[in-house]
């Protein structure tokens, strides 16, 4: 049987919020079977818990934000991407502020934290959402689509008319049965343009942003001294973001996601469209691990 997974131990980290610039204390804790991923604002009294579910997404400007009443948790997508990539079904995420720390702008530090805490299998079958037929959403020239696929695959295309992007790969497709999330996707950092940063800061966004936690691009070059981690780091980060956004379904996916210029808003719209279309998906478990799509047969850390 493919079993649900949680963390073996509690683990803590400290960082800053990308948009708030505030110091944030993060604690990842094991959670019981069928809990899902739950964000907990421990700076509030009483503590407010917000499950990482598509219906709890309230804002999608620059990041994915979970909302419950007037309480928010910003920038959840990179941590959720790491949880998805390592197959963590159940965990509590305690935060001392309204934003998940940005760390280095990728999912790499979260992967390291989760691997350091250890993975613990639980005595219950892991539930997967299997895509049964195509579901798509569009907005202008942006598009996001789910199609049936026996495994988990994410394809993405960006389209920036900019000197830094023109000579680079702007399309990537990752089949996780043959590609390691940890090695090929998790270290791709978020990126931003110098020309946008002043405006963002005037809107109280990107206050914690720097070359320490993002790829910063000016009119014709990458400003980070060390350059890029992957030749296609820009589009790989969009894949990383999409994996985090898709994990708001609450379960691992069996299917393919295709995005063209999609962002957090369209990704969430696709999830809501899928959830509402009950004939387009089903929940499945695997009593015999040998019958499962290969990408889920062992911890991603070992791939």
Curated annotation (Swiss-Prot):
The keyword Metal-binding applies. Its cofactor is Zn(2+). Pfam families: LpxC. One of its GO terms (biological process) is lipid A biosynthetic process. Catalyzes the hydrolysis of UDP-3-O-myristoyl-N-acetylglucosamine to form UDP-3-O-myristoylglucosamine and acetate, the committed step in lipid A biosynthesis. The active site is at 264 (proton donor). Its EC number is 3.5.1.108. Keywords: Hydrolase, Lipid A biosynthesis, Lipid biosynthesis, Lipid metabolism, Metal-binding, Zinc. PANTHER family: UDP-3-O-ACYL-N-ACETYLGLUCOSAMINE DEACETYLASE 1, MITOCHONDRIAL-RELATED (PTHR33694:SF1). Belongs to the LpxC family. Zn(2+) binds at residues 78, 237, 241. This is UDP-3-O-acyl-N-acetylglucosamine deacetylase. HAMAP family: LpxC. The lineage of its organism: Bacteria, Pseudomonadati, Pseudomonadota, Gammaproteobacteria, Pseudomonadales. One of its GO terms (cellular component) is membrane. Pathway: Glycolipid biosynthesis; lipid IV(A) biosynthesis; lipid IV(A) from (3R)-3-hydroxytetradecanoyl-[acyl-carrier-protein] and UDP-N-acetyl-alpha-D-glucosamine: step 2/6. GO terms for molecular function: metal ion binding; UDP-3-O-acyl-N-acetylglucosamine deacetylase activity. It catalyses: a UDP-3-O-[(3R)-3-hydroxyacyl]-N-acetyl-alpha-D-glucosamine + H2O = a UDP-3-O-[(3R)-3-hydroxyacyl]-alpha-D-glucosamine + acetate.
């Amino acid at each position: 049987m493919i079993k649900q997974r949680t963390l073996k131990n509690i683990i803590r980290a400290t960082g800053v919020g990308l948009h708030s610039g505030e110091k944030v204390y993060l604690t990842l804790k094991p959670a019981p079977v069928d809990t899902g991923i739950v964000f907990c604002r421990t700076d509030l009294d009483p503590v407010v818990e917000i499950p990482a579910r598509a219906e709890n997404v309230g804002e999608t400007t620059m990041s994915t934000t979970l909302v419950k009443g007037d309480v928010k948790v910003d920038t959840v997508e990179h941590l959720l991407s790491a949880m998805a990539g390592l197959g963590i079904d159940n965990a509590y995420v305690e935060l001392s502020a309204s934003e998940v720390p940005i760390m280095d702008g990728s999912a790499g530090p979260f992967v390291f934290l989760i691997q350091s805490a250890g993975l613990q299998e639980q005595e219950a079958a892991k539930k997967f959402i299997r895509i049964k037929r195509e579901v798509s959403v569009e907005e202008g020239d942006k598009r996001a689509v789910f199609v049936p696929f026996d495994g988990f695959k994410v394809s993405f295309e960006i389209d920036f008319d900019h000197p830094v992007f023109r000579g680079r790969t702007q399309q990537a497709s990752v089949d996780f049965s043959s590609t390691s999330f940890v090695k090929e996707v998790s270290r791709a950092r978020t990126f931003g343009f110098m020309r946008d940063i002043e405006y963002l800061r005037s809107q109280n966004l990107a206050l914690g942003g720097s070359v320490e936690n993002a790829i910063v691009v000016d009119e014709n070059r990458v400003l980070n001294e060390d350059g890029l981690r992957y030749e296609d780091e820009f589009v790989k980060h969009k894949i990383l973001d999409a994996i985090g956004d898709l994990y708001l379904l609450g379960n691992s996916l069996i299917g393919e996601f295709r995005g063209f210029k999609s962002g957090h808003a369209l990704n969430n719209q696709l999830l809501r469209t899928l959830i509402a279309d009950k004939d387009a998906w089903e929940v499945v478990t695997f009593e015999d691990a040998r019958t499962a799509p290969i990408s889920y047969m062992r911890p991603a850390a070992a791939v």
